[in-house]
Amino acid sequence: MLKRKLGPEDLRRLETPAIERESHGQTSAKSSVPDSASTVAVDFAGVTKSYGNKIVVDELSFSVASGECFGLLGPNGAGKSTIARMLLGMTCPDAGTITVLGVPVPARARLARRGIGVVPQFDNLDQEFTVRENLLVFGRYFGMSTRQSEAVIPSLLEFARLERKADARVSELSGGMKRCLTMARALINDPQLIVMDEPTTGLDPHARHLIWERLRALLARGKTIILTTHFMEEAERLCDRLCVLEKGRNIAEGGPQALIDEHIGCQVMEIYGGDPHELLSLVKPHSQRIEVSGETLYCYAPDPDQVRTQLQGRAGLRLLLRPANLEDVFLRLTGREMEE
C-alpha cells in the first residue's frame, strides 16, 4: 500500500499560516509573543466552572513557577481536563482569573497559545501522513514556513527517537512511538509551556518509562510542564509540585515527598485476606491511623513489627509493608482510593 504524500491541495493549504488565516489580517504569529521573563508561568485565582447545576471546578487557586513540572492529580471527574481547557482559553471560567505566560486568558488566549505546546490525552495525528509530514503541517498552525519547520524537524525527530521512522506513516508506529511523535509535534514552535493531559494513559510499562525519560529531558531544558494524571508513580517521579484535586477543589498542594511526610509520615502495612473490621482491635494500639478500603486494611505504623506480631498465627492473612506514597495521601484526604 502506497503512502499518502502531500498533494497540490495540501501544499496550497500550507502556503498561508493557519494563525494568519484565523486572525483575518491581524498581527502575525511572529510579531508578538507571550512574556518569557515572568517567574510565574500560570496563575489560577478563585476559578470556578459549572455545567448546569454541577460544579466542575470549585474556586480553584494555584500558581506554576517557570521551569517546574506541576501536576494536577485526581481521578476521572476531578476537573483536570476542564482546567486544561480553561488554561488554553477553550473554555471560559464562570468566575476567577487565569493568567498564562503573563497574558490574561481567555481574553488574550490566542497570544498565550503561541507559547504553549499541547499533548492531548488521545493522539490526533494524521494517520496517512508520514511522521515528517505531520510535523510539517503542524508547524503551519504557528505561522511557520516550510523552511522554518524543516530546520527544526531533524532535532525533533532525534528528541522523539524517530529518526529512522521519518518517512513512515503514523499508522505504522507503535503506541509509544505515536506518543513520542505527539510530544515532538507539541514542540514544533519551541513553546515555553507544555500542557500534557494524561500523557501515558494506555501505554505499556516500557513505553511509559520512555515518555518519562523524554519529559525529564524537557525539564532539563528549562521548559515548564503542566501534567494531568491519575498515575501516582508518574506524579511522584516527575512533578516538582502538585495539586491534589477532589471534585474540582484543591485539597492539598506541595512537593510529592512533602505531601507524603505531612499527611502520612510513616510506613504502611497493607493487610489482606481477613475481615478488616475484625482486625481493627488488634492493630489499632500500634498504628497512628487506620484506613479501610474494601477488603484491605491500611495500617500507618511507626513500628510495623508490632503490627506483624499481633497478627501472627492468623491463617489466610497476607501482609505487605511498603513506603508511604501519594495513593495513601489521597486515601487519607478523601477516604477513598484513586480510581481511573
From Swiss-Prot:
The keyword Ribosomal protein does not apply. It comes from the Bacteria. Its EC number is 7.6.2.-. Residues 25-34 have a biased composition (Polar residues). Residues 1-34 are annotated as: Disordered. It is an enzyme of class 7 (translocase). Residues 1-24 have a biased composition (Basic and acidic residues). Pfam families: ABC_tran. ATP binds at G74, P75, N76, G77, A78, G79, K80, S81. The complex is composed of two ATP-binding proteins (NodI) and two transmembrane proteins (NodJ). Part of the ABC transporter complex NodIJ involved in the export of the nodulation factors (Nod factors), the bacterial signal molecules that induce symbiosis and subsequent nodulation induction. Nod factors are LCO (lipo-chitin oligosaccharide), a modified beta-1,4-linked N-acetylglucosamine oligosaccharide. This subunit is responsible for energy coupling to the transport system. This is Nod factor export ATP-binding protein I. The lineage of its organism: Bacteria, Pseudomonadati, Pseudomonadota, Alphaproteobacteria, Hyphomicrobiales. The gene is nodI.
